[in-house]
Amino acid sequence: MVMAEGTAVLRRNRPGTKAQDFYNWPDESFDEMDSTLAVQQYIQQNIRADCSNIDKILEPPEGQDEGVWKYEHLRQFCLELNGLAVKLQSECHPDTCTQMTATEQWIFLCAAHKTPKECPAIDYTRHTLDGAACLLNSNKYFPSRVSIKESSVAKLGSVCRRIYRIFSHAYFHHRQIFDEYENETFLCHRFTKFVMKYNLMSKDNLIVPILEEEVQNSVSGESEA
């Protein structure tokens, strides 16, 4: 999209825009972004530029409030996990995946009910993403996207633990769908590095061997060199 000199760039996909023309505007530096949604825009811009460059995506701009940075990343993870949930619907059915499980040792109870109970995996996935969206859009806990109270930031860890179960179920029970989506988005890889960087989950709960595979591939590459 070439704009005349001095003309403001409309950073929005107009109705009727073709898929190949989505986001067809020049990148901005973070300092040039003057919207209250600047952090979200910056994260999404880096993902579009190269979703495999996880270190770049997770590196905050200088002086960025850490609570807001974690919050905006978690919102983005939930947005992208909806894409995985849509793909899972093709084979993750209530009569075949009757429980939200990962390995045989893990059965997860759904917190969307008054008393947590077992749900079919696809229902658990929907309930969990809906619950995360409700919390992250709550005016009570997150009235501002510019500054966030520490007591609200503390709630992000529980959201991380719950949405991670979507990755783990997909990995252990729908591996082809998981691999295809991961190869497109690097989403589980990015999420794993994110929660480790900010200590939002215990390493013992990170049961999808994403980083182990990375280390093995690195060692294999060095051996072949």
From Swiss-Prot:
Binding, Zn(2+) 1: 92, 97, 169, 174
Binding site for Zn(2+) 2: 110, 113, 119, 127
PTM annotation, UniProt: Phosphorylated on serine residues.
GO annotation terms (biological process): negative regulation of hippo signaling
UniProt-annotated stretches for the region Required for STRIPAK core complex formation: 185-225
Keyword line: Cytoplasm, Golgi apparatus, Membrane, Metal-binding, Phosphoprotein, Transport, Zinc
Bilayer topology: Peripheral membrane protein
Disulfide bonds: none
Single Gene Ontology MF annotation: metal ion binding
Keyword field contains Phosphoprotein: yes
Any one cellular-component term (Gene Ontology): Golgi cisterna membrane
Entries under Gene3D superfamilies matching the protein: MOB kinase activator
UniProt subcellular location: Cytoplasm, Perinuclear region; Membrane; Golgi apparatus, Golgi stack membrane
Keyword Nucleotide-binding attributed: no
Assembly and interaction partners: Binds STRN4. Interacts with DNM1 and EPS15. Interacts with nucleoside diphosphate kinase. Interacts with CTTNBP2. Interacts with CTTNBP2NL. Part of the core of STRIPAK complexes composed of PP2A catalytic and scaffolding subunits, the striatins (PP2A regulatory subunits), the striatin-associated proteins MOB4, STRIP1 and STRIP2, PDCD10 and members of the STE20 kinases, such as STK24 and STK26.
Function recorded in the entry: Part of the striatin-interacting phosphatase and kinase (STRIPAK) complexes. STRIPAK complexes have critical roles in protein (de)phosphorylation and are regulators of multiple signaling pathways including Hippo, MAPK, nuclear receptor and cytoskeleton remodeling. Different types of STRIPAK complexes are involved in a variety of biological processes such as cell growth, differentiation, apoptosis, metabolism and immune regulation.
Family: Belongs to the MOB1/phocein family.
Protein name: MOB-like protein phocein
Organism: Homo sapiens (Human)
Gene behind this protein: MOB4
